[in-house]
Protein backbone atom coordinates (compact mmCIF):
# COMPACT_ATOMS: atom_id res chain seq x y z
CA UNK A 1 0.00 0.00 0.00
CA UNK A 2 1.32 3.41 -0.93
CA UNK A 3 1.46 5.81 2.00
CA UNK A 4 -0.18 9.22 1.73
CA UNK A 5 1.58 12.09 3.47
CA UNK A 6 -0.53 15.03 4.65
CA UNK A 7 1.42 18.13 5.67
CA UNK A 8 -0.36 20.67 7.87
CA UNK A 9 1.15 24.16 8.19
CA UNK A 10 -0.04 27.40 9.75
CA UNK A 11 0.84 30.03 12.26
CA UNK A 12 1.15 29.53 15.99
CA UNK A 13 -2.22 28.76 17.58
CA UNK A 14 -3.93 28.36 14.19
CA UNK A 15 -5.40 24.92 14.98
CA UNK A 16 -2.86 22.56 13.37
CA UNK A 17 -2.76 20.15 16.30
CA UNK A 18 -6.55 20.15 16.66
CA UNK A 19 -6.96 19.34 12.97
CA UNK A 20 -4.35 16.55 13.09
CA UNK A 21 -5.84 15.05 16.27
CA UNK A 22 -9.33 15.02 14.72
CA UNK A 23 -8.01 13.14 11.70
CA UNK A 24 -6.53 10.49 13.99
CA UNK A 25 -9.80 10.33 15.98
CA UNK A 26 -11.67 9.68 12.74
CA UNK A 27 -9.55 6.69 11.69
CA UNK A 28 -7.52 5.47 14.65
CA UNK A 29 -3.78 5.23 15.14
CA UNK A 30 -3.53 2.02 13.06
CA UNK A 31 -4.54 3.96 9.95
CA UNK A 32 -3.04 7.41 10.66
CA UNK A 33 0.35 8.28 12.17
CA UNK A 34 1.35 11.76 13.31
CA UNK A 35 4.79 13.31 13.44
CA UNK A 36 4.63 16.50 15.47
CA UNK A 37 7.04 19.07 14.05
CA UNK A 38 7.64 20.71 17.45
CA UNK A 39 9.16 17.46 18.73
CA UNK A 40 11.96 17.87 16.20
CA UNK A 41 13.52 20.96 17.75
CA UNK A 42 17.28 20.47 17.93
CA UNK A 43 18.84 19.41 21.24
CA UNK A 44 20.84 22.04 23.07
CA UNK A 45 22.30 20.16 26.02
CA UNK A 46 25.45 22.27 25.77
CA UNK A 47 23.50 25.41 26.74
CA UNK A 48 22.16 26.43 30.11
CA UNK A 49 18.43 27.06 30.54
CA UNK A 50 18.81 30.85 30.31
CA UNK A 51 20.65 30.57 26.99
CA UNK A 52 18.05 28.14 25.59
CA UNK A 53 15.28 30.60 26.52
CA UNK A 54 16.86 33.17 24.22
CA UNK A 55 16.98 30.92 21.12
CA UNK A 56 14.78 31.67 18.12
CA UNK A 57 12.53 28.60 18.00
CA UNK A 58 10.52 30.00 15.11
CA UNK A 59 13.30 29.93 12.50
CA UNK A 60 13.53 26.81 10.30
CA UNK A 61 17.11 26.26 11.50
CA UNK A 62 15.74 25.49 14.98
CA UNK A 63 14.51 22.11 13.74
CA UNK A 64 16.36 18.83 13.20
CA UNK A 65 15.01 18.55 9.66
CA UNK A 66 17.40 15.73 8.72
CA UNK A 67 15.97 13.52 11.48
CA UNK A 68 12.40 14.46 10.55
CA UNK A 69 13.02 13.54 6.89
CA UNK A 70 14.68 10.28 7.92
CA UNK A 71 11.64 9.40 10.06
CA UNK A 72 9.26 10.20 7.19
CA UNK A 73 11.27 7.90 4.88
CA UNK A 74 11.26 5.12 7.46
CA UNK A 75 7.50 5.37 8.03
CA UNK A 76 6.87 5.36 4.28
CA UNK A 77 9.03 2.20 4.10
CA UNK A 78 6.79 0.56 6.72
CA UNK A 79 9.20 0.90 9.64
CA UNK A 80 8.40 2.30 13.08
CA UNK A 81 10.29 5.30 14.45
CA UNK A 82 11.02 6.76 17.85
CA UNK A 83 9.90 10.38 17.63
CA UNK A 84 11.75 12.70 20.00
CA UNK A 85 9.79 14.54 22.68
CA UNK A 86 10.33 18.25 23.20
CA UNK A 87 9.90 19.55 26.75
CA UNK A 88 8.68 23.16 26.71
CA UNK A 89 9.38 23.63 30.41
CA UNK A 90 13.14 23.17 29.94
CA UNK A 91 13.35 24.46 26.35
CA UNK A 92 15.04 21.26 25.22
CA UNK A 93 14.39 17.76 23.98
CA UNK A 94 13.75 15.30 26.75
CA UNK A 95 15.32 11.85 26.83
CA UNK A 96 11.89 10.33 26.16
CA UNK A 97 10.69 9.24 22.75
CA UNK A 98 7.28 8.24 21.41
CA UNK A 99 6.99 5.11 19.27
CA UNK A 100 5.24 5.96 16.00
CA UNK A 101 4.17 2.98 13.92
CA UNK A 102 3.95 2.99 10.16
CA UNK A 103 0.41 3.52 8.83
CA UNK A 104 -1.22 4.07 5.44
CA UNK A 105 -1.60 7.78 6.27
CA UNK A 106 1.04 9.97 7.87
CA UNK A 107 0.03 13.38 9.17
CA UNK A 108 2.96 15.73 9.40
CA UNK A 109 2.24 18.90 11.28
CA UNK A 110 4.28 21.30 9.34
CA UNK A 111 0.44 20.95 1.86
CA UNK A 112 -2.64 21.89 4.06
CA UNK A 113 -2.42 25.44 5.44
CA UNK A 114 -4.44 26.40 8.51
CA UNK A 115 -5.34 30.09 8.23
CA UNK A 116 -6.57 31.74 11.42
CA UNK A 117 -6.80 35.43 12.32
CA UNK A 118 -3.62 36.72 14.01
CA UNK A 119 -5.54 37.99 17.06
CA UNK A 120 -7.07 34.56 17.63
CA UNK A 121 -3.69 32.87 17.19
CA UNK A 122 -1.88 35.05 19.73
CA UNK A 123 -4.66 34.62 22.27
CA UNK A 124 -4.59 30.83 21.81
CA UNK A 125 -0.80 30.84 22.15
CA UNK A 126 -0.90 32.87 25.35
CA UNK A 127 -3.51 30.59 26.92
CA UNK A 128 -1.70 27.41 25.80
CA UNK A 129 1.79 28.51 26.81
CA UNK A 130 0.74 29.84 30.21
CA UNK A 131 -1.58 26.94 31.12
CA UNK A 132 0.14 23.97 29.49
CA UNK A 133 3.79 25.00 29.25
CA UNK A 134 4.29 26.90 32.48
CA UNK A 135 5.30 30.15 30.79
CA UNK A 136 4.70 33.66 32.10
CA UNK A 137 2.55 36.11 30.15
CA UNK A 138 5.53 38.47 29.76
CA UNK A 139 7.75 35.73 28.31
CA UNK A 140 5.07 34.63 25.81
CA UNK A 141 4.42 38.20 24.63
CA UNK A 142 8.15 38.98 24.41
CA UNK A 143 8.85 35.83 22.39
CA UNK A 144 5.88 36.52 20.12
CA UNK A 145 7.06 40.05 19.33
CA UNK A 146 10.76 39.24 18.92
CA UNK A 147 10.71 35.92 17.04
CA UNK A 148 7.27 34.34 16.48
CA UNK A 149 5.66 37.20 14.55
CA UNK A 150 8.73 38.08 12.41
CA UNK A 151 9.36 34.40 11.57
CA UNK A 152 5.67 33.90 10.77
CA UNK A 153 5.81 36.78 8.31
CA UNK A 154 9.10 35.56 6.78
CA UNK A 155 8.51 31.79 6.59
CA UNK A 156 5.00 30.63 7.54
CA UNK A 157 2.75 33.10 5.74
CA UNK A 158 4.60 32.75 2.38
CA UNK A 159 4.19 28.95 2.59
CA UNK A 160 0.43 29.44 2.23
CA UNK A 161 0.97 29.94 -1.51
CA UNK A 162 2.32 26.38 -1.76
CA UNK A 163 -0.71 24.77 -0.10
CA UNK A 164 -3.17 22.62 -2.00
CA UNK A 165 -5.86 23.40 0.58
CA UNK A 166 -6.24 26.42 2.87
CA UNK A 167 -8.44 25.77 5.90
CA UNK A 168 -9.80 28.75 7.83
CA UNK A 169 -9.93 28.14 11.61
CA UNK A 170 -8.22 24.72 11.62
CA UNK A 171 -9.85 21.79 13.39
CA UNK A 172 -12.96 23.81 14.18
CA UNK A 173 -13.81 24.01 10.45
CA UNK A 174 -16.08 20.96 10.18
CA UNK A 175 -16.58 21.23 6.39
CA UNK A 176 -12.83 21.25 5.75
CA UNK A 177 -12.26 18.46 8.28
CA UNK A 178 -14.89 16.30 6.57
CA UNK A 179 -13.24 16.98 3.21
CA UNK A 180 -9.88 15.76 4.53
CA UNK A 181 -11.53 12.74 6.12
CA UNK A 182 -13.16 11.83 2.79
CA UNK A 183 -9.80 12.13 1.01
CA UNK A 184 -8.20 9.80 3.54
CA UNK A 185 -11.12 7.33 3.25
CA UNK A 186 -10.70 7.27 -0.53
CA UNK A 187 -6.98 6.56 -0.16
CA UNK A 188 -7.62 3.72 2.31
CA UNK A 189 -10.32 2.17 0.07
CA UNK A 190 -8.06 2.26 -2.99
CA UNK A 191 -5.21 0.57 -1.12
Predicted region positions:
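P-loop (Walker A) phosphate-binding loop of NTP-binding proteins
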Residues: 11
Amino acid sequence: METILIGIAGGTGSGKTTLADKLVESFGSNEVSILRHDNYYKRHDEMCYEERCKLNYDHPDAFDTDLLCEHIRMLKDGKSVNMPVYDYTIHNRSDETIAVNAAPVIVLEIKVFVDTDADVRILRRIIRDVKERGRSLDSVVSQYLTTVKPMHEQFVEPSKRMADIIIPEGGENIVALEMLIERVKKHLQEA
